[in-house]
Amino acid sequence: MNRTNKDLFEQYALMGKALSNSNRLEIMSLLIQAPKTVENIAKETELTVANASKHLQTLLKAHLVKNRKYKNYIYYEVFDENIEKLLTLFFETAQEQLTKANAIIESFAQPSEEEYILSIEDLEEKMQKNEIVLVDVRPSEEYLTAHIPGAISMPVQELEKRIASLPKDKEVVAYCRGPHCLMSEEAIMILEKHGRQAVRFSQSVNDWNLHHVAI
């Protein structure tokens, strides 16, 4: 193998190494939703600002993220659409493998016996028939960045106060950042507590977009 190829593989390894850390993977899972400041990232990941900044510098060097200044803040975002697709596929594949192993996921979020898997095709069919109301329970800035068409923005922290505005004659489908995110699980608990029929859509906006690019 020539030197050029070795150099390329060293660059590939740099990217792989940058992702071989649970904190950095969590940061990337946030950034594929919307650009965020170091302070936002630190708060959502429960890291110190200094530690979050250090992880972001590693991701910058690996060309996985980029930053831009807006007013007095520096925002970090996924480097480009290809990195977003790569991460979406990675999280989706990892989730499938973990589900097959039936170990970590059970300790992370135990589904109810009544829960069923709602596919993208199922969701589209229900939306076309006007059978459901789709609720995006992520923070509002993530909804504004990208959301599933037809979804209503209702952050999980606001859900209980706004639940009366949801139609009572329709099933509520809640989604958040994907299978690793528990905000939609919390939303289902709140909805069911108020006597609403609700189900979780475990896939993300990125999964939705990737599905429609593929067909």
Regions found by a protein language model. Name each.
Residues 2-10, 88-130, 136:
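Amphipathic alpha-helical dimerization/coiled-coil segments
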Residues 11-50, 74-79:
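N-terminal helix-turn-helix DNA-binding core of bacterial DNA-binding proteins
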Residues 43, 60-61:
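Alpha-helical residues within the helix-turn-helix
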Residues 53-54, 185:
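Conserved catalytic core of two-component sensor histidine kinases
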Residues 56-57, 74:
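Short, hydrophobic-biased segments on the C-terminal half of alpha helices
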Residues 61-70, 77:
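Beta-hairpin "wing" of winged helix-turn-helix
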Residues 64, 166-209:
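Catalytic cysteine-centered active loop of the rhodanese-like fold, especially the PTP/DSP P-loop
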Residues 124-180, 186:
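Positively charged, proline/Ser/Thr-rich regional signature most characteristic
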